[in-house]
């Protein structure tokens, strides 16, 4: 294969992307309606988990209702500090569905770096894995305005709300802020990069076209979410 093969193939992609969804939550709900029993997520390991589209959408919907009932409002920021897990993905989609801005934080960062990102992003609530308790304990007292919620498993999230009411995510627009990704900060403090729902959906469609994904494709995620 020639070294410039990927560049040549990339230049063939049409960038006239037509979006059929109003936001990321709209994408999830419509795909769950179209493919309720199709496999959506597999989390291998000691606590092996699998979700169909409908199962995942149900948990996301329940968790979204909890986030709203807890007092969080559209455009509020929430930080997520997890290793790759179903809990991270449920909270990620749930937050986006109700118009929150997600601030994912690499759990391998130091307590000082985590504290800086929470403060800089003005995150109101911080969800974190119970495996990170010792790291979070070091910064809790100095972040008195933030609410910390430890999450052990997907069952914790399901138990947060028992409502079956379907969430209406129509109040979230394509141009609303969706995620703030912080850089590694190799030459200083990490810098936040803002992505909208439009950015996320356009990226997803571009990647899907680039790799020629089909309904039968499976993607292996190794890097931190």
Predicted regions, residues:
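AMP-dependent adenylate-forming
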Residues: 4, 27-51
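Flexible, low-complexity linker/hinge segments
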Residues: 13-22, 156-177
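Adenylate-forming
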Residues: 28-31, 41, 56, 60-63, ...
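Conserved AMP-binding/adenylate-forming
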Residues: 45, 49-50, 63-109
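Conserved AMP-binding A3 loop
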Residues: 50-54, 178-202
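Conserved structural elements of the adenylate-forming
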Residues: 57-63, 193-214, 219-223
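Structural core segment of the AMP-binding/adenylate-forming
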Residues: 69-70, 97-160, 167-170
């Amino acid at each position: 294969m020639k070294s410039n093969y990927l560049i040549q193939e990339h230049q063939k992609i049409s960038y006239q992307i037509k979006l059929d969804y109003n936001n990321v939550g709209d994408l999830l709900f419509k795909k769950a309606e179209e493919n309720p029993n199709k496999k959506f997520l597999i989390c291998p390991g000691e606590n092996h988990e699998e979700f169909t589209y409908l199962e995942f959408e149900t948990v996301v919907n329940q968790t979204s209702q909890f986030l709203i009932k807890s007092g969080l409002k559209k455009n509020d920021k929430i930080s997520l500090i997890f290793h790759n897990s179903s809990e991270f993905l449920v909270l990620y989609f749930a937050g986006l569905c109700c118009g929150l801005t997600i601030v994912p934080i690499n759990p391998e960062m130091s307590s000082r770096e985590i504290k800086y990102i929470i403060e800089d992003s003005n995150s109101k609530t911080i969800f974190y894995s119970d495996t990170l308790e010792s790291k979070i304990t070091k910064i809790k007292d100095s972040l008195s305005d933030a609410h910390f919620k430890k999450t052990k498993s997907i069952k914790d999230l399901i138990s947060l709300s028992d409502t079956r009411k379907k969430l209406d995510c129509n109040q979230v627009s394509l141009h609303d802020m969706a995620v703030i990704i912080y850089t590694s900060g190799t030459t200083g403090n990490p810098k936040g990069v803002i992505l909208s729902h439009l950015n996320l959906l356009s990226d997803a469609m571009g990647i899907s076209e680039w790799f020629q994904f089909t309904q039968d494709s499976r993607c292996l995620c190794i890097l931190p979410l």
